[in-house]
């Protein structure tokens, strides 16, 4: 088990109950999506999965370690977080410095940091961006540089809040390829999204949130063919599920669907 959540609730200082009594588990090596409308509690839930927010009530366990103030450094080595807005994690004078920032905080030596940063720049094919200020980059470039700063830490889990929002199709494909490579290494991906078509094709498992509550969870095909759950959450059924959900097995991609015709 990568992540276990038990009876997790969180109330913001303004009195808003963001999430209420959440119980969930995220399987190791799987891609799990968290879906729901804006304000349903997705981001607040994800913020708990690397200690960005600490539990008020309930427990969060990351790869066998309970999240608390004392375990934050250890937890964040295991679970990296990618914010919806990359400006939240790109704030130094150059891309190179930003990518190495987390390693520096861990007390790693300069030579080790430089070697690790050089490796990830080459792996993601962004060596040409290393001397740029983050403020000179496009949104897509910022997102890829931000995930480089996560991957350089070599976490077992990546938590992504709306990783594809605002990206054009070309950058989205490049970003998906990065996550695919991470997944092929047997690592765990947990992400929120409003793109139900992509989620239906790519996610292994799905959790559905509505008004701070977790109302359903299961494999992607089962969840996205459950009209009652989708209606309650205000989610539109993915096109492939709407057209071919009655098939067994149901096609998960356009290519698979074309093979049925």
UniProtKB/Swiss-Prot annotation:
Compartment(s) where it occurs, according to its Swiss-Prot or TrEMBL record: Cell inner membrane
How does the record classify its membrane topology?
A: Peripheral membrane protein
Major localization class: membrane
Q: Which UniProt keywords apply?
A: ATP-binding, Cell inner membrane, Cell membrane, Membrane, Nucleotide-binding, Translocase, Transport
Entry binding sites for ATP: 36-43
Look up the EC number in the record and give it.
7.-.-.-
Say which domain of life the source belongs to: Bacteria
Q: Which GO terms describe its molecular function?
A: ATP binding; ATP hydrolysis activity; ATPase-coupled transmembrane transporter activity
Listed InterPro entries: AAA+_ATPase, ABC_transporter-like_ATP-bd, ABC_transpr_CbiO/EcfA_su, ECF_ABC_transporter_ATP-bd, P-loop_NTPase
A Pfam entry, by short name: ABC_tran
Where's the ABC transporter domain? 3-236
| Described purpose of this protein according to its UniProt entry | Probably part of an ABC transporter complex. Responsible for energy coupling to the transport system.
Can you tell me which family this protein belongs to?
A: Belongs to the ABC transporter superfamily.
Full protein name: Putative ABC transporter ATP-binding protein TDE_2132
**Native organism:** Treponema denticola (strain ATCC 35405 / DSM 14222 / CIP 103919 / JCM 8153 / KCTC 15104)
């Amino acid at each position: 088990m990568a992540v276990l959540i038990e009876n997790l609730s969180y109330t913001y200082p303004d009195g808003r109950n963001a999430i209420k009594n959440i119980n969930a588990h995220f399987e190791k090596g799987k891609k799990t999506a968290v879906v729901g409308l804006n304000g349903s509690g997705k981001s607040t839930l994800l913020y708990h999965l690397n200690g960005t927010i600490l539990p008020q009530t309930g427990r969060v366990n990351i790869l066998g370690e309970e999240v608390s103030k004392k375990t934050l450094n250890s937890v964040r080595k295991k679970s990296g977080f990618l914010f919806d807005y990359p400006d939240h994690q790109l704030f130094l004078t150059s891309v190179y410095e930003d990518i190495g920032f987390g390693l520096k905080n861990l007390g790693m030596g300069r030579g080790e940091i430089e070697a690790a940063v050089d490796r990830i720049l080459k792996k993601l094919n962004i060596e040409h961006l290393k001397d740029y200020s983050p403020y000179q980059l496009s949104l897509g470039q910022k997102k890829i540089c931000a995930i480089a700063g996560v991957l350089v830490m070599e976490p077992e889990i990546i938590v992504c809040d709306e990783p594809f929002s605002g990206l054009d199709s070309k950058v989205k494909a490049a970003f998906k390829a990065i996550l695919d490579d991470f997944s092929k290494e047997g690592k765990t991906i947990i992400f929120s999204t409003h793109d139900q078509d992509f989620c239906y094709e790519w996610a292994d498992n799905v959790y559905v949130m509505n008004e701070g509550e977790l109302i359903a969870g299961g494999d992607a095909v089962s969840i996205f063919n459950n009209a009652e759950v989708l209606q309650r959450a205000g989610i539109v059924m993915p096109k492939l599920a709407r057209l071919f959900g009655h098939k067994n097995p149901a096609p998960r991609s356009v290519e698979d669907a074309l093979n049925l015709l």
